[in-house]
Amino acid sequence: MSERFFSETPITGPRAELRGAEAHHLTRVMRAAVGAEVTLFDGSGQEFAGRVARIDREGVTLDIVAARAVNRELAGPLHLGVALPKGDRQRWLVEKATELGATRLVPLICERSVAQPTPSARARLERFVIEATKQCGRNRLMEVAAPSTLEDYLATAPAAARRLFAHVPDDPSGSAAQTTSLAAALSQAGHAPNYETFVAIGPEGGFTPTEVAAAHKNGWQLVSLGPRTLRVESAALALVAAIALRKRSDEED
C-alpha cells in the first residue's frame, strides 16, 4: 500500500494515531487491516514508515517502523499573495500551488476583490493543501496565512527578497514603461538559488492604478505574463511554475 497519510499530531515516539478523515480514508476507502504498511507525514519534513497495529471506533494506531528526512521543497521560500477567485477555482489554485512547491499562500484583500476570505474558507483551503501534499509527496504543508490587505503585504515583504507584482502593461495606469516580462525578471542576476520570493496576483478586474503605484513605490518589480489576459489561477500558477523551474535551474548551474 503506497498511500500517504497525514498525522495532525507530531510524530515523536514509536506510535502514531490517525483520527477523523485520515482514519476513515485508511480503513473505509483503502480497506486497510492490521499489519498493513503505509507512509505517514506530519508536516515536519520527515516521512515515516508505519504499520497498522490497531483499528477501533476512535481511529487507527500505527507502529512507526522507520523515519527518514526527505526534502522535496524548493530552494528558498516562495510566498504567493493572491486575490482568491470564487468557487471551485480556489481549490484548483491551492492544489496546484502546493504541487509546484509554494511555501505560503496569502489571500489578498484588494480594491476589486470578489471573494472575501473567512475563517471557514481558510480551514477549507488548509484541507485542500493536505490532500495535495499527500498526492505530490511533499513532507511540509504549504501554509495558508491569514488574509492580508495588499498594502500590508507589499510593505512587509523584505527588500532583499525578489518581489514580483503581476501587472497588465497596457492598462491606463501609465506604468507600462516600468513593466518587464517575467522571463526577463527571472533571468536577472543577483540572487542565489535559495533566494526568498514574494509574488502578488490581483483579482479578476486587475489591480487598480493606485495599487500599481503602491507596488512600484515599495520597490516591487512589475512583471507582465504576456499579451493575453489570464484568469487569477492561471496567472498565479504561471508565476509559481516559472519561479520553481528557475530555482531548479539555478541549483543545477
Residues of each region from the PLM?
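Residue-level signal for inorganic ion chemistry
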Residues: G35, A97, V129, A215, ...
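A generic structural signal for short beta-strands and their flanking turns/coil linkers
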Residues: P14, V34-A36, Q46-F48, E58-V60, ...
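Active-site/ligand-binding-proximal alpha/beta "capping" segment
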Residues: R163-A214, W220-S224
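N-terminal-biased segments
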Residues: R28-G59, E151-A189
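N-terminal positively charged helical leader segments and presequences
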Residues: M1-A69
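Structured adenosyl-cofactor binding patch, chiefly the S-adenosyl-L-methionine
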Residues: P209-D253
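RNA substrate-binding interface of SAM-dependent RNA methyltransferases
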Residues: V65, N71-V168
